[in-house]
Amino acid sequence: MTRMIDDVFKRKTIIPKRLSDFGFQKSAAGYIYKTEFLDGAFLAVITIQNNKIDGHVIDLTTGDEYFQINVPAMQGSFVNSVRTAYQKILNEIAEKCCQAALFASP
């Protein structure tokens, strides 16, 4: 199973100097970006350490990670709306903070 974040950032190179302008905060371990979405129901947490990007979606009602976004078998209008909103966040980060890595291996 491929995670959505891995698909979005495949063959992309992160440009560190663009991260702060986008809203990432520098931390001891790297960079972190947090943003609420879907009217504050969810929190996207994106981290970058050693040029590797990782992300999680937290359901703010329960405080639990909303893992359903990465399970293709999970379908329905609600989970699809969460996926779409999260993908929009990831796509914006990729567009504004990365460049294409033309010769990267898959």
Language-model segment annotations:
Residues 1-2, 7-9:
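A short, structure-level motif marking secondary-structure boundaries and short turns
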